[in-house]
Amino acid sequence: MTTHLLIAVSVSILSAGCMQNNNTTHDQDSVDSTAIAAINADTYAKNVAALSSDEFEGRKPFTKGDTLTVNYIESQFKALGLQPGNGTSFFQEVPMVEISSKPVNPILTFKGDKGALSVQYLDDYVIGTRRLEEQINIPSTDLVFAGFGIVAPEYKWNDYENLDVKGKTVIVLASDPGHYDKNLFKADTMTYYGRWTYKFEEAGRQGAAGVLIIHDTKAASYGWDVVRTGWSGPQMDLDNKENAEPKAMYEGWISTNTAQQLFKMAGISNQVIESAKKPGFKAVPLSVSTSVQLKNSFKYAKSNNVIAKIEGTKRADETIIYTAHWDHLGIGETVNGDSIYNGAVDNAAGVAALFEIAKAFQAAKVKPERTIVFMAVTAEEQGLLGSAYYSNNPIYPINKTVANLNMDAFSPLGETKDVSIVGFGQSEIDDYVIRSAHKFGRTVRGENNPTSGGFYRSDHFNFVKKGIPGLFMGSGNELISKDTVAIANRKKALTGRYHAPSDQLDDNWDFGGIMADIRLFFDVGYSLSLEKTFPQFKIMSEFRELGEKRTAK
């Protein structure tokens, strides 16, 4: 039995399971046609066009585009008749720091007994710091190959076991062991241990002076161009001096070619690298050192999450939070004569969906019994910072937050028969998606590329870390249209736009699939809004214990 068929025929079983005691008089197996009709492709396209226009300069926090964007979102929330989501305000200030960090010398030189290797900034390596120090000066730091740089007791894996890395630079592989051996970790599905953010965090906890991740396109799920673009300008972090976690003095990436040359110079064979992908690996000193000097400047400012709500009619203290990040990359490297990274798919598309879903809730015949919150969060591209700040400074109690439904990019390729759930199997939210999809004649499956760690790469993850089930859906693969020529042309036109100036709204967009996905997002939240149940994490989820503690409060 295929996964699609298995999921489709399981609808009745699932509906009879976690959702059977929902104590609602509303027919959960039907669609509110009046609400659905309020979701409109024309108004949606108009908002995407505005948010992704050159006028908004790529919507980077701390820029003119920041001010234009948050004011635009507030104006739309007001025009829709939504209530302010933070007391009398639509804004939640997010204190951040913009860190401009560059090597004093763009040439980084590694020195060893068998020679030296010099590499070029951006072409071969990228480094920076999250430490709030004007200068980072490391006269000499020895390099250690530390496997994946992972400490995971539940998987009996510790790359730092009996290893003192204080003052040293750790070189680590991208992803986690499951990427290479399906019997390890979660096989093809990346765990949080495979994320670059985790590797930086762990190196800091271990006291390393520096950490360099070896880039691999397949393991990272994106090319060196994405790394280069992401690190070529200022980086942002929360201004959190009082509760700052330990950080390495510098962090960054090296290209595959650089790593190969480095290991060759150090006399490290491929066998050693392959052994790092198996249990029992012990870190290997490279007998190579380098020196690092960074000059840093800081800009302290506040960006904003923009928040609105529709108050519930019966259980107003219980909330369902829709999120979409409003920020993108601003103005950056020029590509084909264009330097504005407009971010139409990523994520003007998600913000515009907030407005359409709000319209649907307002048009619903039966009004939501729980409060519906619409939150456009800042600084997702810089490390999920807006949602991280909210989750640590919640306006609505964590233990009364039912779920987070996160919208980050929609596919403009056209309508599909199926829909994907990123992180399928994590929580009972999956069951609501299956039931809602069934109403629209759609099937549900897991994500396209579980090796990318998508579940840990968008704003819902900050809610998940607090024990709140989070939904992150992606478009399906089974396009309904049979016009293969048009589909092929559309795919060709849209290829290569991720984090590029070419991510713009144009005639290649087919809004049919986006509207279908927005309708589904609405129906899932609407179903939850009429129930008394709190969806839980599933037994095999690493977040189940967190969820149980949250609802026990």
Where are these regions (language model features)?
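Soluble metallo-hydrolase cores and metallopeptidase-like ectodomains found primarily
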Residues: 32, 111-115, 125-162, 242-343, ...
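Active-site-adjacent substrate-binding region
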Residues: 204, 215, 278, 282-287, ...
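Catalytic-core environment of secreted peptidases
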Residues: 36-56, 61-84, 111, 164, ...
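Noncatalytic luminal/extracellular "stalk/propeptide" segments of secretory-pathway proteins
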Residues: 57-182
